[in-house]
Amino acid sequence: MSDNSKENLRQIKSYVQRAGRVTKKQQQALDDYASKYMIEYDQNKSLDFSEIFKNSNDVVLEIGFGMGGSLVQMALENPTKNYLGIEVHKAGVGNILYEIEHQNISNLLVMSHDAVEILENMISDNSLSGMQIYFPDPWHKKKHNKRRLVNQSNVDLFAKKLKVGGVFHYASDWLPYAEEVLELLENDNKYKNLYDGFAPRPEWRPLTKFEKRGQNLDHPISDILFEKI
């Protein structure tokens, strides 16, 4: 892929910023807790994870945590890992801020900005022990495929930010998208598949709302786990 093609892909957003309904509880959480648990986007500042988490534990980045239920569960079940979640929709951000505060979660922080810009400008190379993208928008119409978050340009970007040995975990209920991601990663010499093809569903990955919806529609659930080499 040419540099110009990669740049064009970067400029196409993988999401649509909808107004959406924000409940009173979510708005209250945004007002009360954003200063405690949210990191503002600053294109001129690289994050120092040991400073913001106040420890040197491994950091896992999740892009698009939705309402945040599965990410909250993972943070609670893995207290020796730090989690940074990115979500652009206010309702989900408000929801997760409420949970962080009321469940006293100390290893989870949140950002609300374009994930690619955060990765490019605020995440140091070779700094993440894991990246996870669960049930991203499949943009299933062919004319919208270019909006998909996991594309060749971003796969290269993810590899830059992962440590050697860091794991990229993708899950989807839209098989054509999952097959496309699997092919991208299989053909990239910066990654090694931890399984032969698709991975079995990990017991430690919490069930998400979108996964349940996919199951109700009889969509196959695909997990992909690749290690940076």
From Swiss-Prot:
Q: Which PROSITE patterns match?
A: SAM_MT_TRMB
- Quick check: keyword Metal-binding in the entry? no
State a single Gene Ontology molecular function.
tRNA (guanine(46)-N7)-methyltransferase activity
Q: Which InterPro entries match?
A: SAM-dependent_MTases_sf, tRNA_(Gua-N-7)_MeTrfase_Trmb, tRNA_methyltr_TrmB_bact
Provide the E.C. number(s) assigned to this enzyme: 2.1.1.33
The pathway entry for this protein reads as:
tRNA modification; N(7)-methylguanine-tRNA biosynthesis
Residues the record lists as binding S-adenosyl-L-methionine: 62, 87, 114, 137
Taxonomically, the superkingdom here is: Bacteria
What biological function has been recorded for the protein in this entry? Catalyzes the formation of N(7)-methylguanine at position 46 (m7G46) in tRNA.
Q: What is this protein called?
A: tRNA (guanine-N(7)-)-methyltransferase
